[in-house]
Amino acid sequence: MLRIGLTGGIGSGKSTVADLLSSEGFLIVDADQVARDIVEPGQPALAELAEAFGQDILKPDGTLDRAGLAAKAFVSEEQTALLNAITHPRIAEESARRFNEAEDQGAKVAVYDMPLLVEKGLDRKMDLVVVVDVDVEERVRRLVEKRGLTEDDVRRRIASQVPDDVRLKAADIVVDNNGTLEDLHAEASKLIAEILSRVN
């Protein structure tokens, strides 16, 4: 099974590319979705988070109050490290389980949609690394327009991620998303053809 890591900075259009790959029948393991799944009621990570950060991070129905957790987890580097120590191993474990399940079911390709692929060193575990790339100023413009974020907030988020040149060095294939949505569809079609050529 061909394991593909798909990544890109915030506002790069990575999720759009993941959706286009999914619509072609490729299995997507979405790291953000896995992160949500591992803190569902009944999951060990949720109990550990409540123990570490206090029972008041739980809503009355027993689900995680994300804003409440964020308010406690991002006040210091130590608290953020504690959050990561609880969640990151579980995300890695569950993601690996989903990859193995896909392989057992005969999938030829599985795509790991992971914002922090390079930061976490997971690019080295992939057969193919795809980076969706957009100029920083264009990403800022799109995020301010489409998500209603402030420019300062966008720039802070971009600065918290690995620089684009580091991400690009890890890439086997770069999908350029500086153009229109139609251009991105054309880039995705080329990517799909490249993937299929490697598995057929």
From Swiss-Prot:
- Domain named DPCK is located at 3-200
Looking up PROSITE patterns in the UniProt record yields: DPCK
User: Sorted alphabetically, which keywords does the UniProt record give?
Assistant: ATP-binding, Coenzyme A biosynthesis, Cytoplasm, Kinase, Nucleotide-binding, Transferase
Which Gene3D superfamilies does its entry note? Answer: P-loop containing nucleotide triphosphate hydrolases (3.40.50.300)
Q: Quick check: keyword Cell division in the entry? A: no
Task: Describe the reaction catalysed, as an equation.
Answer: 3'-dephospho-CoA + ATP = ADP + CoA + H(+)
Query: Which InterPro entries does this one have?
Result: Depp_CoAkinase, P-loop_NTPase
| Pfam family for this entry, one | CoaE
E.C. number(s) listed in UniProt: 2.7.1.24
Pathway annotation from the record: Cofactor biosynthesis; coenzyme A biosynthesis; CoA from (R)-pantothenate: step 5/5
Q: Which SUPFAM superfamilies match?
A: P-loop containing nucleoside triphosphate hydrolases
Q: Which GO terms describe its molecular function?
A: ATP binding; dephospho-CoA kinase activity
> Could you state one GO cellular component term attached to this entry?
cytoplasm
Q: Which PANTHER family match?
A: BIFUNCTIONAL COENZYME A SYNTHASE-RELATED, DEPHOSPHO-COA KINASE-RELATED
What does the UniProt function comment say about this protein? Catalyzes the phosphorylation of the 3'-hydroxyl group of dephosphocoenzyme A to form coenzyme A.
Q: Which family does it belong to?
A: Belongs to the CoaE family.
What is the protein name for this chain? Dephospho-CoA kinase
Q: Which organism is it from?
A: Corynebacterium glutamicum (strain ATCC 13032 / DSM 20300 / JCM 1318 / BCRC 11384 / CCUG 27702 / LMG 3730 / NBRC 12168 / NCIMB 10025 / NRRL B-2784 / 534)
